[in-house]
Every structure is written in C-alpha cells, then in structure tokens.
Amino acid sequence: MVHQVLYRALVSTKWLAESIRSGKVGPSLRVLDASWYSPGTRQARKEYQERHVPGASFFDIEECRDTTSPYEMMLPSEAHFGDYVGNLGISNDTHVVVYDGDDLGSFYAPRVWWMFRVFGHRTVSVLNGGFRNWLKEGHPVTSEPSRPEPAVFKATLNRSLLKTYEQVLENLQSKRFQLVDSRAQGRYLGTQPEPDAVGLDSGHIRGSVNVPFMNFLTEDGFEKSPEELRAIFQDKKVDLSQPLIATCRKGVTACHIALAAYLCGKPDVAVYDGSWSEWFRRAPPETRVSQGKSGKA
C-alpha cells in the first residue's frame, strides 16, 4: 500500500492567530466561518457580522448547495462551487481554514472541509477547537466585513469521495463498503425523533453501524487524538483498512467520520450526500430499520 502524504486536516488556534498577526491572510490563506444553526435558534450570519476571526469570510452553506434538490444539503455543481468560493478570494492555490461557532467546538466546518476536498482541493484544514476555543483563549475578533479580491477556482469533482443513493442501494447486495452512520444513537435506532424534520421518521439504513460524531470530540471541543479515534472505530468493529461510506441525516455530520478517518491516515472515506433524508423517501421499506412505533421507518 502506497502511503500518500496527507495535508494537515487540522490547524491550531495558536497557528491561525500567529498567521493573522504576521499578515498571512490573503490570496494564499483564506479563513471561512461556516456556521449554521437550526431555524429559530441562533443566527449564523448575524453572529458573524457581530464578531468573527479577523479576515474571515462567511461561507453560507444555504447558498452553496443544490437548491433545486428536494433533499436538504446536496452538493452544488462544480461551476456553482467554483464561482462561490472564487468570490470569497479562494483560488486552487489557497490554503483554506474553516471553522464554525457551534458549542460543540465543531459541527459544520468538517462538511465544508469535505466539500473542498470532493471538488479537488487538497489544501484545506479545520480550525481545531473552533470559534468556541478561539474566544476562550482570548484571540482577536472583529466585526469588520471581509472583502477579499475575487479569484478563479476551478472545481473538479472527485467522485470517489461521493456516494449516491443508487450506489448505496447496490452496496446492500455487494457489501463492498462498510456503512457508518454518525447520528446520535436514539435517532439511529428510531427511538428519538429527527430534530426540525417534517415527514422524516428516524431510523437507519439496514446494515449500517452507528458511530455518533460527538464521540470524536473532547468535552472542550477539540478533535481527539488519532489513537483515541482509532480506538473508537475499532470498538465499533469498523476496519479502517477497508472501504467505508459515511452517512447521517443530510450529509453534514457524516463528514466528521471522513475527518476522523483522515486523521487516522485514511483519506478515502466517501460520503453519502443524500443520507437518511433521501434514503427514507426513496428506499424500499425493508431497507429502513427503526425501533420506533411502526418497527420500520
């Protein structure tokens, strides 16, 4: 097996603070606030406008998605993604650092990290500890809007990192890939409802294994060490030497599985973009498992 040199998936708050202090934010280094919150809770863009990491732009995941899809957070086209990030001053040569303001330390940032990778961009990192720890450690913030000079970003979809409904359905027969679901246990089992979901019962895809993404984070909001991450996968009998598909409700926290595996030296985890929100609406009933009222999701 050839071991490729992996780009650093995490950068520290100290490293980013020093990079900002030394004036490195610009065409070669861009910072993105990728916060998103459930409607009626926090307002991500408003919070960004009030305070953010100096030089950071707001990455609106509601804008940078396939808005024509009936499913929740499907990838945009190559052209849409390229135009969107190009307008944030990002070229194919830019090192991109992504963070969010979630209380967990990280929630949506790994989704944007994966989006860059699935569109062919290697030099992207998540801010370890997120905005929560940036603030806690007393690093500078600003309300000043960021106005980066637009750049040209050519997006090239890496289909090996993305799985479709048809591919996951075929995998139920072939079992070539392990299927790992990152949602909380109750939602996976079908004993707790999907939050803010209309017409979407909880449950899981037959044959999937549950590894809740919160397990990858420390109480302080940092990513656990590669040794701890490996132990989490091993405990659930997930073999990191074998192919793996990550799934969740809408393709967001599945990216935490991709990130955790990457930190263990496995960069090839594919994400099922439609995840449960698509599977529940399209898949045959016998492929949907739930311990809820009806027994089948």
From Swiss-Prot:
InterPro entries: Rhodanese-like_dom, Rhodanese-like_dom_sf, Thiosulphate_STrfase_CS, TST/MPST-like. GO terms for biological process: epithelial cell differentiation; iron-sulfur cluster assembly; rRNA import into mitochondrion; rRNA transport. Expressed in numerous tissues. It catalyses: thiosulfate + hydrogen cyanide = thiocyanate + sulfite + 2 H(+). GO terms for molecular function: 3-mercaptopyruvate sulfurtransferase activity; 5S rRNA binding; sulfurtransferase activity; thiosulfate-cyanide sulfurtransferase activity. Residues 25-143, 173-288 form the Rhodanese domain. Changing R249G: Unaltered rhodanese activity; increased MST activity. Substrate binds at R187, K250. Glycans are attached at S35. The modification N6-succinyllysine is found at K14, K136, K175, K224, K237. Contains two rhodanese domains with different primary structures but with near identical secondary structure conformations suggesting a common evolutionary origin. Only the C-terminal rhodanese domain contains the catalytic cysteine residue. Monomer. This is Thiosulfate sulfurtransferase. The lineage of its organism: Eukaryota, Metazoa, Chordata, Craniata, Vertebrata.
